[in-house]
């Protein structure tokens, strides 16, 4: 490749900022600017080059099959121009992105082979490797996951789903196509790459412009002063009429970097090249964007009777002759074939003489090009009916009395169990199954989170289970709890732990795990799992999981709310959970985990044990809400607060259905005390109930009056909460945590 000529102005120029630009900077600017069909913005590029001797330029590719000349020759020319102008070029080998986009069937080993093959071509074809770094996305992200993933999540939080969908052209898709959740994650990650690589310039194709603009918009949102300059290069069309770009899946549309001379000749011969027409003519495009920049001239050899040989120095001269008919399509094609073959010969030689390159090419040629995402939406959702059989065996396994007893304890936690036979089988075979529970630290703790969790965890540990409680701090951030402030979220998590300790949780066999710490520590295992779940589930399926965040699929969602279910599903496998013990509102994502097992043919599916959701205190409130204090009793509420809230609670006489006071007796008081004492002098005297059925019978007949029910409920709740109050009054750490939490504003 010949030296690059620089057409520089003879005098220095001045930027709008008032900065004087030297002739040297003008020269560098002209070289760098020549790379892009479009620059956003020219003044910023000049300013950057004037202030920074070695700006960082980000380029990249998905390793996805054989390399065509648009990827090969144009990238080589662009990189060589950039390094000649003093830039440091970071070439991002986007293996994880190819995986999410299901290139090569999502086979990371094959993707790695293709990446190495690309590097061999760049070397053989003349890329100047000085000031060029090839970086594998998986390696770099794994090495600095604690820096990268919070950035991805922040971008996801700050952009609506609609904004992200507008970036689908970067993957050759439209926002109206059937998308997978991975396509949403892909955009957020590519946007993050710009900042992760500390790029001053994004040098990618015009088809990547939407995500580069997203990065600039993100700078505005986070008030980052230095935005990346976008330098978008031209997209070479395919060889046939109407093909906007070369396609690996259609070999006739593209010339590959190791094509033999005869193959190049045949492809160019068959290429679309209408006489006298320049617009939409791929042969002329290749001359303009490859041959002229490479050789600085284009030589046409022909008989004297057709005008003789001619060497063109500018594209304008070529188009003038072509439009007038002086340059015939056949002569153009012959000259183009000859020039391309001259450029490609060193690559052919390298792949014939270098054994490593030869082996790589052989493997790559054997790979099938794929694009279809293997979504789990085609997998039939399993039957959700509950097996209520009281059989003492599961899958033909005879259960011991001890296993039967364990089963009854564990099963009593769940309003629903999917599936009971699987639970019996698990308890019969595994002495200490792992149970996954968790919470978003998002404000004060109400009794549904406090008392019910203590009761459930103590039951599980008494039955031999190991309980892993997932403190979902990153999830609270994704859901914009406490304004997404991780320091505040951390404070709330510590406050929750204090309450459970004071409330009587047996910490033997219980682990509290911070999501951010665990994910950062095991990122190389966790994030590929998230990506695989995302690529196997279409967007509609993930949207149906919005309920786990208290959202509906019709709401205006951020991209974070697509990432959240994929991550929560991955948590189950990261924690190696046998049982998912969460509320009924989390059921859809737990089902997603079981569907994923079916999709990847994993035999042991997590058992779903979904506990009841306590309603709010007022009529029609499906669950307690921290944002409405009148709907909830908090774990450190004073006795007077509890009494006032219960006295105002909805409690219609003789009506059991939708009666929150009776719900609290059933799910909090009876499991805690194994009895419910009602004291009443005027309404039949004192009575102790040992079953909820007896309470219901008396309430429906009117023998148990709402006023007496409420008084007994107040007393039982206050007995339960008193140790927590005492702890938060006497323990300085707990007292300080509570003061902070009470001051935090609840946000959504």
From Swiss-Prot:
Indicate the principal place this protein occupies in or around the cell: cytoplasm
Intrachain disulfide bonds:
none
Q: Name one GO cellular component term.
A: cytosol
Null mutant phenotype reads:
No visible phenotype under normal growth conditions.
Instruction: Give residues annotated as binding ATP.
Output: 626
Task: Tell me the Gene Ontology biological-process terms attached to this UniProt entry.
Answer: tRNA aminoacylation for protein translation
What Gene3D superfamilies does the entry give?
A: HUPs
Q: What does this protein do?
A: Catalyzes the attachment of tyrosine to tRNA(Tyr) in a two-step reaction: tyrosine is first activated by ATP to form Tyr-AMP and then transferred to the acceptor end of tRNA(Tyr).
Q: What's the protein name?
A: Tyrosine--tRNA ligase 2, cytoplasmic
